[in-house]
Design a protein with these regions (language model features):
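Extended alpha-helical surfaces
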Residues: 1-200
């Protein structure tokens, strides 16, 4: 998508906005992690020049920010402020939780952009691709948690983007509460995502 955006006409630039948002979120998360770790020099600002020119704020300004307060002030006019202002940075914060909130914002913007630029069957197909991608990421997370991390059901549920799920609620609950990876695969074998099992 980044390569397409490089050569896209101005009339289509909004459609590729989600690529920029993804880049900006990654940079913001990197900055938050470096501030929490108090390792200013661990922040890496390395993206293609043509992407840097299209960002919604001057990303170079992130380099010299040395506190959470300064970061919030710097991003106060951006779409990310409404998420970041709700976080208490005076205490150690959950990096995963912050990333989930920003990722939700990312998906919201993709949906809005698709609905703005496309109608009818094209819009339906694009949304279907997006929702399927999110569902597969959810399923992949559940499987990994069951296979490697043995997380609690509440922890697993909080890591998923269920607002975009089209799996029946009962099926999703059964996947989350599965006793292990084998049960997850068994449940998937009876769903529309049976192809996802591959050679597991």
């Amino acid at each position: 998508c980044a390569k397409l955006m490089k050569y896209s006409p101005k009339s289509d630039e909004d459609f590729y906005l989600f690529e920029i948002i993804g880049v900006e979120i990654n940079l913001i998360m990197d900055k938050l992690v470096s501030l929490q770790a108090k390792e200013q020099y661990s922040f890496n600002l390395s993206i293609p020049t043509y992407l840097a020119k299209k960002t919604s704020f001057n990303i170079d300004g992130l380099v010299n920010i040395e506190s959470f307060k300064d970061l919030l002030q710097y991003l106060s006019k951006t779409r990310y402020y409404k998420v970041l202002k709700e976080i208490d940075f005076s205490v150690p914060f959950d990096v995963k939780e912050v990333h989930m909130c920003l990722q939700s914002l990312y998906y919201e913007n993709i949906v809005e952009t698709i609905k703005k630029h496309f109608k009818g069957s094209v819009q339906k197909d694009l949304l279907n691709i997006l929702y399927t991608s999110i569902e597969l990421k959810n399923i992949s997370k559940i499987y990994r948690y069951k296979q490697y991390f043995h997380e609690s059901e509440d922890s697993i549920r909080s890591s998923l983007f269920l607002q975009y799920s089209r799996l029946p609620k009962d099926m999703m609950n059964r996947l989350i509460s599965a006793s292990g990876p084998k049960e997850v695969l068994s449940l998937l074998s009876t769903s529309k995502y049976n192809f996802y099992m591959d050679d597991k």
